[in-house]
Amino acid sequence: MPRVEPCLGYVVGHPEGMILFDTGMGSHPEVDAHYRPRRVGLREALAAIGTQIADISLAANCHLHFDHCGGNPLLGQIPVFVQDTELGTARQAPDYTLPELIEGSRFEQVTGQAEMLPGVFLVPTPGHTDGHQSLIVRRPDGVVIVAGQSHDTATQYAADQLAWQAHRDAHDQPLPGFPGWIDALQQLNPKMVYFAHDRAVWTP
C-alpha cells in the first residue's frame, strides 16, 4: 500500500553547542527509483531555521539506515555519536545502508547511555535496529525525547506507553507487552516525544 511519510531531523540548541540528530535521506539510483523522495538537503533544511552546518558542534544518528544518515558526509569532522552495535552492523552487514554515507564520518562510538552535553544524553532504544538510540533533552520546563524510529508513529508509542501504564497500575491480565526501555523513558516523565517519520508529537 503506497504511503507518504516525512523523514525528519532535529536541531537541539544548547549553551555549549548545537546538536543535530539525524541528517536526512541519502541518494542512490535504486533508492530514488523505489522511494521517489522529495528531498530538502541538509544545508537547505538548516538554512530554513536560520543556521548552517558550521554552527553544529555535535551530531548523532538514531541508527544508520540510509534515510537517517544521508547528510553525514557533509559534516566533515563534526563528531557523530552512534551506538557501537549500530556502527558494527552498518560496516559489516550487506545491504544494511549505503556504505558511502558512513565512510569518512568521524564517529564517536558509545555503549549504552552516553552524555553528549550537560543535560543531553543518548539512551539505547533497540527494536527497529539492535543499535537504535534516542536523544533525551532535559530542559527547564521538562524532558523532551527525540525517539527517532523507535516507533514509526506517535500512535504506536502511545500504545506502548498505555501498555506500560497498565502493567504499572496492575490492571487485570492479559495485557499487551511493550519494549523494556519504555519504562526508562517514562520514568523521565517526558513532556513531549518526537519521531523521525511522524510529524505528530506524543504528549501525556
Task: Tell me the role of every PLM-derived stretch.
Residues 1-44, 134-152:
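Conserved beta-strand hairpin/beta-sheet module of binuclear metal-dependent hydrolase folds
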Residues 20-22, 80-81, 146, 193-195:
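A structural signal for short, well-ordered beta-strand segments and their strand-loop junctions
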Residues 25-26, 66, 86, 151-152, ...:
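Short, glycine/acidic-enriched loop or turn micro-motifs at the edges of active sites
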Residues 29, 38-67, 79-124, 129-202:
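Metallo-beta-lactamase
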Residues 70-76, 204:
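Metal-dependent catalytic neighborhoods of phosphoester/phosphodiester hydrolases
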